[in-house]
């Protein structure tokens, strides 16, 4: 059933999001840069006169998976087993905890989504934030974008029990390209550079991400412990460090300042700490482009190297900013691959194929070890070329996307 043929007295839609810059940094308290994409999840709703919710996913129904749920306005138990209804229950639970239960009314909701599940494009966040906006609209809750993001985060993190950061929910709620500060009060900076076109490539590889974050966090903790217990480390440096991955003031630590002391730890721990510092520096550089700040050759070479500068120098003037952002993406992909061990041969084939037909840059989007690749391209036609090239090397599916809008009320 196509979205255009479906009806509801209230219709809400929420976007998927791609993990654009500073991947794997939100849980360290560092800023991240998500981008909303054109693929959207639609909620077709009919308000009820009671306090009962019914939810139905046409996509899961089509796959023969559990696709319906019914529950009331109260603190609902999670059914577990990755049941999709738990995300809806989680949103209601958070609102009840916030004292808004008395304002809620029942709704019949049917969901139809363009966002593939498990592809690293935040289908769960689109569901949480979209449902929160539906309740906000129907029940007159007067919730702002940040409220919707925080409710979605609490639903997934605290109610469903997924150890996620806030990247996905904020990216879905605000839309566009944003810089999200990942320490309280979680400031959001909408970035003005929106003339970007992406090819989003689903590798088709489904890898459990449950052990990806804890293993790398453990590596960082091991390295930090070695630094904190070393008598060689200056006290001034230790003041900016800590014993766990989320304690250091990473933005105040320069690689030059710390690199001479990294010999006190094992190679994996060293790689994880270098990754953190280099990824942040790369993102700070890219943010200048996204804010339309002027940068010169010297700064480009310092951040990206001479070889990448040569690629940028050869590009037409009107494409130069896009080329710089593409080279930043390539650089960040290399960091994810070489210092965070998150790539696979099949993912490398997809990245190479996209660059081979003219993408400006390509990188892992999401946790890694599968999921999606995001490639920056000149236009929609070039995006289709990239998708065809990636499909020819084994990718499952692809979409061309401009920068999308955040969660919104379509009608009702």
Language-model segments: residues:
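Phosphate-handling active-site elements
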Residues: 97-106, 135-151, 379-392
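Alpha/beta catalytic cores of group-transfer enzymes, especially the acyltransferase/condensing modules
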Residues: 142-187, 362-365
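DPxDG-like acidic metal-binding loop motif
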Residues: 36-39, 121-141, 374
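C-terminal nucleotide
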Residues: 2-17, 21, 42-86, 96-97, ...
């Amino acid at each position: 059933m196509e979205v255009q043929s479906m009806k509801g007295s209230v219709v809400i839609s929420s976007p998927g999001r791609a993990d654009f810059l500073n991947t794997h940094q939100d849980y360290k308290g560092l800023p991240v840069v998500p981008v909303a994409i054109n693929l959207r999840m639609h909620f077709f709703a009919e308000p009820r006169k009671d306090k009962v919710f019914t939810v139905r996913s046409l996509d899961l129904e089509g796959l023969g998976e559990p696709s319906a749920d019914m529950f009331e306005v109260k603190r609902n138990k999670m059914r577990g087993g990755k049941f999709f209804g738990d995300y809806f229950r989680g949103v209601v639970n958070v609102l009840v905890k916030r004292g808004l239960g008395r304002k809620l009314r029942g709704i019949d909701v049917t969901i139809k989504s363009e966002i593939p599940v498990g592809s690293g494009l935040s289908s769960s966040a689109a569901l949480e934030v979209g449902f929160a906006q539906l309740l906000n609209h129907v029940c007159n809750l007067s919730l702002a974008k940040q409220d919707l993001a925080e409710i979605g985060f609490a639903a997934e993190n605290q109610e469903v029990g997924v150890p996620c950061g806030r990247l996905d929910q904020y990216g879905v709620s605000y839309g566009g390209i944003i810089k999200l500060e990942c320490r309280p009060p979680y400031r959001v900076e909408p970035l003005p550079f929106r003339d970007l076109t992406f090819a989003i490539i689903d590798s088709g590889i489904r890898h459990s991400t449950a052990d990806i974050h804890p293993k790398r966090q453990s590596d960082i903790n091991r390295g930090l412990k070695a630094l904190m217990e070393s008598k060689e480390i200056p006290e001034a440096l230790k003041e900016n460090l800590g014993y766990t991955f989320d304690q250091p003031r990473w933005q105040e630590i320069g690689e030059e300042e710390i690199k001479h002391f990294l010999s006190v730890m094992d190679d994996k721990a060293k790689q994880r700490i270098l990754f953190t510092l280099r990824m942040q520096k790369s993102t700070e550089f890219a943010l200048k482009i996204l804010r339309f700040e002027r940068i010169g050759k010297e700064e480009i070479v310092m951040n990206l190297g001479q070889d990448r500068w040569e690629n940028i120098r050869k590009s037409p003037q009107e494409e130069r900013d896009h080329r710089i952002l593409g080279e930043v993406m390539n650089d960040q992909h290399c960091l994810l691959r070489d210092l965070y061990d998150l790539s696979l041969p099949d993912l490398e084939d997809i990245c190479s194929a996209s660059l081979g037909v003219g993408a400006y840059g390509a990188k892992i989007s999401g946790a890694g070890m599968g999921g999606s690749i995001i490639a920056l391209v000149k236009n929609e036609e070039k995006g289709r070329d990239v998708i065809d090239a990636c499909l020819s090397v084994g990718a499952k599916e692809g979409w061309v996307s401009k920068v999308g809008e955040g969660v919104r009320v379509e009608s009702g």
